[in-house]
């Protein structure tokens, strides 16, 4: 019996030794493959200077990494390379590289069509969306362009004014018998703006229960989607499929998306059938009382003949429309919500702006008897200037104009000329352009009236007007088609908050306004505010 026990013990020891050897060997293979991937990525850039942490390894394997100030390095590279007409390369969110073109080369690049340089395909890759969402279809862009007419914009404005007034109290009103409440600013703004975005997408005829459920699901989806992207970006390429398959964050993301589709897809199919059956379908979204971006998205598909011919194709079409509706929600909530948050940080830190903007809005409301009409924002140029300066100072990224080459492209506007192979990403500086003293007087100082023209009582140029020196929405043919909607949502929600509530900083002192994540810039989520209803 003792001999048999010794044999089993020896066998277990041998098995443990073999298992340990293979685990060490697999770990060694992971590190080596990751190093080779990083080396190849850097080598593919040739002589282009690289601005990053200086490592070939993924973040999770950089055991002895040194502190890296991305914004300072990008600023240094802008003055060293971009201002002298030279490109450089920077690591972006998904862990790969993009070539940063100098502003002098951008005019030619912006004229190149999406068949050669695609933003949507770049978005799918750098934001890690392709695993759970198809963002490469141009239907959302087509639908947004279809909204750029006077009637639709007016209906959007009327609906926006109503929805912003409706969705603030549940988030910002203090509990009963309390004069004030303490809230995390970013989280609260995203909660309110998410509800507004859902209402604009689904329209006023959608059942309240569905609107509430989609709002909660889409808010969670947007948050967990970013968390999943950040998580996968930490790991070597060889391990990313395993992270997607087994990590708790990725499983949560898939579960949220599954629940959203279970509620949204039947509603989308119902609307498709209704709009197909009614000859007046083209007018369904042409009044504020029935305004729905989802209906416009469906109608745009009708007009452009993106129609299914079989039940299977119909299911796929409804699923794709669901994904695009969620993409709409992300675009109409995240960027405007970020802007609203930064504006609140500014008025809490500088209360004089709150007084000025309230006085302007009181005057703007008088002609309509205090009603929030569709044209109310046009009578508030100081608010528009304040919003535009916020976009300038607190752009959500150090770079814009992200594109990926879909086929070989020669850029002769760069010296020496660049040859872009398929899969190469490019982008251009934005934040450093906004902070350049050649473009703006005292550019590092926030001036809420920087764009206000007292002579004409206008914001000049308008907040949604892009230029080579104002780039939060990029510029040229590739500029964001939803920027008009996004800026109006930001201004309307912010001014409704300012008119309805008093805000003061709950932190002992104002923390840093924003935090860097690679090339992206987000509001600091730890800023808290004390809120009370005005007039109480």
From Swiss-Prot:
Molecular function, one GO term: monooxygenase activity
Positions annotated as glycosylated: 149, 371
Subcellular localization, as worded in the UniProt entry: Membrane
Primary location class: membrane
Pathway given in the UniProt record: Secondary metabolite biosynthesis
Cited InterPro entries: Cyt_P450, Cyt_P450_E_grp-IV, Cyt_P450_sf
EC number(s) reported in the record: 1.14.-.-
Any single biological process term in GO: secondary metabolic process
Catalytic activity annotation: 2 7-demethylsiderin + NADPH + O2 = desertorin A + NADP(+) + 2 H2O
Cell cycle in keyword set: no
Keyword terms, alphabetized: Glycoprotein, Heme, Iron, Membrane, Metal-binding, Monooxygenase, Oxidoreductase, Transmembrane, Transmembrane helix
Co-factor(s): heme
UniProt key word Transmembrane: yes
Transmembrane segments: 12-32
One GO cellular component term noted in the UniProt record for this chain: membrane
Top-level enzyme category: oxidoreductase
Residues that hold heme according to the record: 480
Pfam families found in the cross-reference section: p450
Topology class, membrane: Single-pass membrane protein
Annotated family: Belongs to the cytochrome P450 family.
General function of this protein: Non-reducing polyketide synthase; part of the gene cluster that mediates the biosynthesis of the bicoumarin desertorin. The non-reducing polyketide synthase desS first catalyzes the formation of the pentaketidic 4,7-dihydroxy-5-methylcoumarin from acetyl coenzyme A and 4 malonyl coenzyme A molecules. Further O-methylation by desB leads to the formation of 7-demethylsiderin. Then, an oxidative phenol coupling catalyzed by the cytochrome P450 monooxygenase desC forms the 6,8'-dimer M-desertorin A via dimerization the monomeric precursor, 7-demethylsiderin.
The protein's name in its UniProt record: Bicoumarin synthase desC
Organism: Aspergillus desertorum
Lineage of the species this protein comes from: Eukaryota, Fungi, Dikarya, Ascomycota, Pezizomycotina
């Amino acid at each position: 019996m003792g001999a048999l026990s010794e044999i089993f013990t020896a066998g277990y020891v041998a098995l443990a030794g073999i298992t340990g050897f293979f685990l060490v060997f697999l770990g060694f293979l992971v590190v080596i493959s990751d190093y080779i991937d990083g080396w190849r990525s850097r080598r593919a850039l040739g002589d282009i200077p690289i601005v990053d942490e200086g490592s070939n390894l993924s973040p999770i394997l950089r055991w002895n990494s040194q502190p890296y100030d991305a914004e300072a390095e990008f600023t240094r590279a802008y003055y060293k390379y971009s201002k002298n007409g030279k490109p450089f390369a920077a690591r972006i969110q998904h862990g790969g590289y993009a070539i940063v073109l100098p502003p002098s080369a951008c005019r030619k690049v912006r004229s190149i069509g999406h068949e050669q340089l695609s933003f949507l395909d770049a978005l799918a890759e750098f934001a890690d969306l392709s695993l759970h969402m198809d963002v490469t279809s141009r239907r959302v862009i087509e639908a947004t362009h279809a909204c750029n007419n006077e009637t639709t914009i007016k209906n959007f404005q009327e609906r926006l004014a109503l929805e912003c007034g409706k969705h603030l109290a549940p988030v910002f009103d203090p509990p009963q018998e309390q004069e004030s409440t303490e809230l995390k600013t970013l989280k609260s703004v995203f909660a309110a703006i998410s509800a507004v975005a859902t209402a604009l997408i689904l329209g006023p005829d959608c059942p309240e229960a569905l609107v509430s459920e989609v709002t909660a699901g889409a808010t969670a989806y947007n948050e967990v989607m970013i968390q999943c992207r950040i998580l996968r970006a930490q790991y070597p390429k060889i391990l990313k499929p395993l992270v997607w398959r087994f990590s708790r964050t990725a499983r949560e993301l898939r579960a949220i998306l599954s629940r959203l589709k279970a509620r949204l897809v039947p509603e989308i199919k119902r609307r498709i059938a209704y709009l197909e059956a009614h000859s007046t379908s083209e007018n369904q979204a042409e009044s504020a009382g029935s305004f729905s971006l989802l209906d416009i998205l469906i109608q745009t598909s009708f007009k452009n003949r993106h129609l299914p011919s079989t039940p299977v194709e119909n299911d796929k079409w409804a699923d794709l429309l669901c994904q695009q509706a969620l993409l709409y929600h992300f675009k109409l909530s995240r960027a405007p919500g970020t802007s609203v948050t930064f504006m609140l940080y500014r008025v809490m830190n500088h209360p004089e702006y709150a007084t000025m903007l309230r006085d302007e809005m009181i005057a703007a409301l008088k002609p309509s008897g205090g009603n929030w009409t569709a044209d109310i924002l046009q009578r508030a140029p100081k608010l528009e200037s304040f919003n535009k300066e916020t976009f300038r100072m607190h752009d959500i990224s150090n770079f814009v104009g992200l594109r990926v080459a879909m086929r070989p492209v020669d850029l002769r506007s760069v010296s020496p000329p660049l040859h872009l192979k398929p899969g190469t990403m490019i982008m251009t500086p934005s934040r450093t352009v906004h902070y350049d003293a050649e473009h703006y007087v005292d550019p590092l100082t926030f001036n809420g009236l920087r764009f206000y023209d007292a002579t004409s009582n206008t914001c000049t140029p308008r907040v949604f007007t892009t230029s080579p020196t104002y780039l939060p929405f990029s510029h040229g043919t590739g500029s964001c088609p939803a920027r008009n909607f996004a800026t109006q949502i930001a201004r309307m929600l912010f001014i409704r908050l300012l008119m309805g509530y008093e805000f003061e900083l709950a932190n002992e002192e104002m923390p840093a306004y924003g935090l860097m994540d690679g090339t992206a810039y987000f509001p600091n989520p730890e800023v808290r505010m004390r809120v009370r209803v005005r007039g109480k």
